[in-house]
């Protein structure tokens, strides 16, 4: 008598693979917005004057209400400054940062109309040398796609800069 288990297992796996391939994935694409570039240049000068070195920067094309995960290796005890600049027409800007254990270590939110509302900037000194994930998101009711965002990672000068790199990973819809 033949065992039905292999057939059942194969059927379940085929359904799971169909379901997972149907999910939308947003790929990292750059964008260009002159007002964001001017803001980024101004912030780069300000942080350079404060003794920070720019490790990485990237312009990213985003969709409204979708997170754009950015993964970076951070060194224990080093002082980092992370900056996210969103499209000035968006109504809400948010950044969450998680450590390797997926514990949320930073949360910042700004709304349109706040002073520097489209810029979120925060300092962070990691307790461990490990990868961290930043998840910037912006909400825009008029433009759903092709929102420009800009991320920058700075490190306090005089500290080992290592090989930090910004990497975008697959996106999941924000829980707003």
Language-model regions: role of each:
Residues 79, 90-94, 146-148:
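Exposed beta-strand and adjacent loop surfaces of beta-rich binding modules
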Residues 107-114:
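Solvent-exposed serine/threonine-rich low-complexity stretches and specific carbohydrate-binding patches
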Residues 24-51, 127-176:
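C-terminal edge strands of extracellular/lumenal beta-sandwich accessory domains
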Residues 89-104:
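Short, surface-exposed beta-strand/strand-loop-strand elements in extracellular ectodomains
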């Amino acid at each position: 008598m033949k065992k039905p288990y292999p057939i059942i297992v194969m059927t379940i796996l085929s359904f799971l693979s169909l379901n997972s391939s149907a999910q939308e994935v947003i790929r990292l694409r750059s964008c260009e917005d002159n007002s964001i570039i001017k803001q980024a240049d101004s912030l780069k000068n300000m942080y350079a004057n404060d003794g920070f070195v720019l490790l990485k920067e990237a312009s990213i094309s985003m969709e409204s209400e979708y997170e754009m995960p950015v993964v970076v290796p951070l060194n224990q005890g080093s002082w980092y400054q992370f900056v996210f600049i969103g499209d000035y027409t968006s109504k809400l800007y948010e950044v969450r940062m998680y450590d390797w254990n997926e514990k949320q270590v930073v949360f910042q939110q700004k709304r349109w109309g706040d002073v520097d509302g489209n810029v979120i900037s925060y300092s962070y000194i990691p307790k461990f040398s490990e990868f961290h994930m930043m998840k910037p998101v912006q909400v825009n009711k008029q433009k759903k796609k092709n929102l420009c965002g800009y991320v920058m990672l700075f490190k306090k000068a005089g500290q080992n800069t290592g090989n930090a790199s910004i990497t975008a990973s697959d996106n999941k819809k924000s829980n707003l």
